[in-house]
Amino acid sequence: MTPSEFRQSVRSGAFRQPTAGQCGPFAQANLAILPNAYAHDFLRFCQANPKACPLLGVGEPGAFRLDVLGEDLDIRTDVPSYNVYRDGRLTERVESLEALWRDDFVVFAIGCSFSFEDMLAREGIALRHIEEGRNVPMYRTSIPNRRAGIFGGQLVVSMRPLRGADAIRAVQITSRFPGVHGAPVHIGHPRELGIADLGAPDFGDAVTVRDGELPVFWACGVTPQTALMEAKLPLAIAHTPGYMLMTDITNASLAVF
């Protein structure tokens, strides 16, 4: 299935699941959508936190199509699930933004670690959340983001349990792709990140961590949602964690070496 065909399946309501493992050679994107009045500070926030918020594209006010991300792409309809925040609180999840869309909305598309999972799988590195048919586990850490204006919050990380040799190979592979979070930020000791229980993720689903495996943590594009919550904007929108926008950008084109 091509990315365009996948987006059409989302738009028609046929696909409403987490997007890990879909259209493997193509990059997926996190979304943050907010009024133009706050867009400059949010852009500065992303630039100050490039590990968690690597920008793939930024739209013009009111634009719900970003040609840099793909043809026949509609931000309002092509994500399986959206989070709607009002005054910093998650008030609802919706499957379309057509009724909520405003002429002053600015779209920020942020790289997603689902993008490099295809490369890991090609190297024979098994990914537990895909094996178990679950959403990837994501955790809010105790590490503060670099603040920009009203935007701060804490770093969010995704976790994949790997054996030592696979963890080393994963570092080597993902280091080539800073546009989709790059190398892990931590391996092995969740408490050093302020994570008390791997079995209780803040977002996504818990997965099995087997004996002899290390939890490997990558910076996560859900990080901006902690900033949106802390800023308490009257209205802001994001993807539901794990339910991403499929782009036409090839993962290979994002490699830096």
Curated annotation (Swiss-Prot):
One of its GO terms (molecular function) is lyase activity. This is Putative hydro-lyase BamMC406_3459. Keywords: Lyase. Belongs to the D-glutamate cyclase family. Pfam families: D-Glu_cyclase. SUPFAM superfamilies: PSTPO5379-like (SSF160920). InterPro entries: D-Glu_cyclase, Putative_hydro-lyase, UPF0317. Its EC number is 4.2.1.-. It is an enzyme of class 4 (lyase).
